[in-house]
A protein has these predicted regions:
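Extracellular glycan-binding segments that recognize GlcNAc-based cell-wall polysaccharides
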Residues: 330-424
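Boundary/entry segment of secreted carbohydrate-active catalytic domains
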Residues: 1-43, 60, 329-374
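Surface-exposed, active-site-proximal loop segments in enzymatic domains
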Residues: 69-81, 100-116, 188-201, 243-252, ...
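Aromatic-rich peripheral "rim/lid" segments of glycoside hydrolase catalytic domains that contact
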Residues: 5-19, 24-27, 53, 247-339, ...
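Aromatic- and acid-rich polysaccharide-binding/catalytic face
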Residues: 38, 63, 97, 139-143, ...
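Substrate-binding cleft of extracellular glycoside hydrolase catalytic domains
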Residues: 41-43, 49-151, 382, 396, ...
C-alpha cells in the first residue's frame, strides 16, 4: 500500500510557521509520506496555512490532543477548533495519550477506583463532538503492558461501550497502536491470540510462547475488538521504527529501508512474513525531527534544519526518484504509441464485390470476441494500427500488401485461409 508512510512531527508547538512548511513539505513529499501526526494545542489552532499546505501536498495530518485524561479541558473548549480543522480538510483526531499509563492522569487521580469507567466518561464526549464535526476519532495509543495492563484496559473499554449502548463506538472504528519492538524481532507475537496463549499480566512469557509486547501489538488488539464488537478496526501504527520510546532507542536490528519495505508491502503479494493487511492505514515513524535541546532528537530521522540523520534516507529517496522516472517514461511511451498508432488492433478482411461470405463472419467471431479489433477492408487504413491481423483468405492479399504493413511499423499476424480450412 503506497500511502502508508508517515511521521510524528516535532513534539512542541513551535514549528507550525510558513518557513517550517517550506522546509518539511518537500522532504516529506520526496519520501512519498502521506501522514503526519501533529501535536495539537488546546488554546489555539495550528495555522490554517500549515494545515492546508500539508493537505494540498497530499499529506494528511492526524491531530493529537494529548492533554491528561482528567485535566480541565472540556469538549466545549475544542468546539471551534474542531469545526475549523474540519473545514480546512482535517479528517483524523486523537484525544489523550496512553491512558493506561500513570503519566496520562493528574497527580492523585490514578489510584481512584473505576479507572476505565472514568476514562470512558471523559473520552466519549470528545468522540461525539469530533463526529458532529465530520471528523474521525482515533482511539489513543495504549502503552503495551503499561501501568494498567493494556489488554485488560482495552477489553474493559470495549465491553463497557457495548453494555452502555449509548454510543455506537463500533462504526468506522480507528485505533492508534504502538509498534515499538521492545528489542523483539518483527514477527514477535504475530498471529495474536489465535496463535499464542493470552499472556499473564506482568509475568515472564512462558517458554515457547510469545506475547503482544512488540511490533505486532495491533494483532492482539484486533482480536479483542473482533471478540467483543465483532468488527475489524482500522489501525495507525505509531512510534514506527522504535525499539522503545522510554529509552529513546531506535530498533538497530531493522533499518529505515527495511521498515519502509514492511510498510509498503501489499497484502498477499509479498514474501515478507510481516506483510500488513489493508486495514493498517498508516505507519508513522518516530520521529521526523526535534529541536536540538529536545531529548527526542536522539531518535529523529532529520535534524532541525532538514538534513537526514539516517543513512538509509538518501538511498530511499534515490530509489523513489528512479521509480518515478520509470513510471513517467512508461506513461510518455504509452502516449507516444497512442499518437503514432491511432488504432491499436485492426482486423483486415478481404473485400469482394458481392460482399463477405457468411462462413468468414462465423470464423472471425472468436477474434472479435477476444480482441475487439477495429474491422476494415483497407490496407492503407490498416497501416495506422499497432497490430494488424490479416485475414488472408484465398490469397486475397499479396506479399506486397503484407510488406507494406510491416514497413509501416505494424505488428502483422497473418491468417492464411483457404476454402477448406485455416492454416497458420
Amino acid at each position: 500500500m503506497e500511502k502508508r508512510l508517515g511521521f510524528h512531527y516535532f513534539q512542541d508547538y513551535d514549528h507550525y510557521q510558513a518557513r517550517d512548511l517550506e522546509l518539511w513539505v518537500p522532504e516529506l513529499a520526496s519520501l512519498q509520506a502521506s501522514w503526519l501526526v501533529l501535536k495539537a494545542p488546546t488554546a489555539a489552532a495550528i495555522p490554517e496555512e500549515f494545515i492546508t499546505g500539508l493537505i494540498q501536498a497530499g499529506i494528511q495530518p492526524i491531530l493529537h490532543f494529548d492533554f491528561q485524561v482528567n485535566s480541565d479541558v472540556r469538549p466545549e473548549d475544542l468546539r471551534v477548533l474542531l469545526s475549523s480543522y474540519a473545514n480546512w480538510g482535517v479528517k483524523h483526531v486523537i484525544f489523550f495519550d496512553r491512558p493506561n499509563a500513570k503519566s496520562a492522569w493528574t497527580n492523585g487521580s490514578w489510584s481512584q477506583g473505576d479507572l476505565v469507567e472514568r476514562f470512558l466518561d471523559r473520552y466519549l464526549p470528545f468522540v461525539r463532538l469530533a463526529e458532529q464535526n465530520g471528523l474521525i476519532p482515533v482511539f489513543p495509543p495504549l502503552e503495551p503492558g503499561g501501568d494498567y495492563w493494556d489488554l485488560s484496559f482495552l477489553k474493559k473499554v470495549l465491553q463497557l461501550v457495548q453494555q452502555r449502548r449509548s454510543f455506537d463506538f463500533s462504526v468506522n472504528f480507528h485505533m492508534a497502536v504502538s509498534s515499538q519492538t521492545f528489542d523483539h524481532p518483527l514477527d514477535w507475537g504475530a498471529g495474536g491470540q489465535s496463535r499464542w496463549k493470552s499472556p499473564r499480566p506482568y509475568s515472564k512469557v512462558d517458554l515457547g510462547e510469545e506475547d503482544h509486547i512488540g511490533f505486532n501489538t495491533w494483532h492482539w488488539y484486533a482480536d479483542l475488538v473482533s471478540e467483543v464488537l465483532n468488527i475489524t478496526p482500522k489501525f495507525f501504527l505509531f512510534y514506527y521504527g522504535m525499539a522503545r520510546i522510554a529509552g529513546n532507542k531506535l530498533d538497530a536490528d531493522n533499518s529505515f529501508e527495511q521498515m519502509v519495505d514492511v510498510a509498503l508491502a501489499l497484502s498477499g503479494e509479498s514474501r515478507n512474513t510481516n506483510t500488513l493487511p489493508d486495514n493498517v492505514l498508516g505507519c508513522c515513524f518516530w520521529l521526523l525531527s526535534a529541536a536540538e535541546s529536545d531529548p527526542n532528537g536522539k531518535t529523529s530521522y532529520f535534524d532541525a534544519n532538514g538534513k537526514p540523520k539516517e543513512a538509509g534516507i538518501p538511498a530511499y529517496k534515490q530509489k523513489i526518484e528512479q521509480s518515478t522516472k520509470q513510471k513517467q517514461e512508461y506513461a510518455v511511451s504509452s502516449r507516444l504509441a497512442e499518437w503514432i498508432y491511432p488504432i491499436d488492433h485492426y482486423l483486415l478482411l478481404p473485400s469482394y464485390d458481392w460482399g463477405i461470405p457468411e462462413n468468414t463472419l462465423d470464423r472471425i467471431r472468436p477474434i472479435i470476441r477476444d480482441a475487439r479489433p477495429t474491422i476494415g477492408f483497407s490496407v492503407i487504413e490498416a497501416t495506422n494500427a499497432r497490430k494488424v491481423t490479416v485475414w488472408n483468405e484465398n490469397a486475397a492479399f499479396s506479399e506486397h500488401d503484407i510488406q507494406l504493413l510491416r514497413e509501416a511499423g505494424c505488428m502483422v499476424e497473418e491468417q492464411l485461409i483457404n476454402s477448406i480450412g485455416i492454416t497458420v
